[in-house]
């Protein structure tokens, strides 16, 4: 059984008990540590909001994704 959420406006199914860390890892294709940084030490370069509230990187691992959640994953870009 899966849970349906929206990620950047697109419906997506995830496993029950999934966290923001799990979702970011799946979307970026990178292993993410519990501190929200890439395991390989490189920058992840994304910010996450769950139901219009920003989720601090340090809380990704403990923030569960539940049915009906609307998740926005924004990629950071340089510029001015």
Model regions and ranges:
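Ubiquitin-like/PB1-type beta-grasp interaction modules and other compact soluble beta-rich domains
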Residues: 1-79
